[in-house]
Swiss-Prot record:
Homodimer. Interacts with FtsZ. It comes from the Bacteria. The keyword Transport does not apply. It comes from Clostridium beijerinckii (strain ATCC 51743 / NCIMB 8052). This is Cell division protein SepF. Belongs to the SepF family. It is found in: Cytoplasm.
Length: 150
């Protein structure tokens, strides 16, 4: 009876077969280059001329007195072109001036620059290659070189 059941299982495809996969181990050989084949790279440091692209002989200063918020992009473009920008916001409404300062301070931060207040409503934006010291800031505010209230 066991014979009949095994024949039926084999016809239906249910017969258990133990299959063994035979694997052949392949051997890999690493190709090693001789040290004689490697050529050293020789650089001539005397002929290489590296120039900083951000070096400029003259620094330009842009002085703006915006009358609306739309001028914020022009201020940021000047800062992006590595110019020092003086911004006078005394003629703007308080809310518009705050929005303008938020926008240009974010751009200044993204470009690696610095925003400092000189006087009430007057700000200086300096690019990353320019440093404004506190002595200069104190001197500008004490001498009132930029008297915008006239």
């Amino acid at each position: 009876m066991g014979n009949v059941i095994s024949k039926v299982k084999s016809l239906l495809g249910f017969e258990d077969y133990e299959e063994y996969d035979e694997y052949e181990e392949e051997q890999y050989e690493e190709q090693v280059k001789d040290e004689d084949e490697i050529e050293p790279v020789i650089t001539n440091k005397k002929n290489s001329k590296v120039v900083n692209i951000h070096t400029s002989s003259t620094t330009k200063v842009t002085i703006t007195k915006p009358i609306d918020y739309e001028e914020a992009t022009e201020i940021c473009e000047a800062l992006k072109n590595r110019r020092i920008v003086l911004v006078n916001t005394t003629v703007l409404e308080l809310k518009i001036a705050q929005r303008l300062l938020d926008f240009i301070s974010g751009s200044c931060y993204a470009l690696g620059g610095e925003l400092q207040q000189i006087e009430k409503g007057v700000y200086i934006l300096s690019p990353s290659n320019v440093e404004v010291t506190n002595e200069l800031k104190n001197e500008l505010s004490s001498k009132a070189l930029f008297n915008w209230s006239k």
